[in-house]
Amino acid sequence: ELKTGEAKRQSVHLITKLGEVSVRRAPQAETVARYVKKYLDKKVPVILCGDFNDSPLSYTHRTIAKELNDCFVESGNGPGISYHKSGMYFRIDHIFCSDDFESYGAKVDNSVTTSDHYPIYCWLKYRPKP
């Protein structure tokens, strides 16, 4: 239980930390997006996945999603919570793919308890372009 004033202090601390992290991650996201675009420009199919430590509402996610599709958005159900510790519940693990793939059946496997992240997976059907 937080004492009077403590909740506000904790909120300000969290917002400050999130802002600092966003400033560091923005150039990283832009670098990844440029790298991905080089392959897309060569018509190379792309799958990009991992622990991005950023929610679907983040600058990082928006930057990557300009070039690639979020497979969970395309074929998942519900919030898709992949991080589940310390009272924080977000989808910060992502699978992205180019238009060369159709995603289906995206899920979070919340039966795995050995990590603070649940695995996220989906099926991808390759659909080559003519």
Predicted segments, located by residue:
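Metal-dependent phosphoester-hydrolase catalytic domains
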Residues: 26-47, 52-130
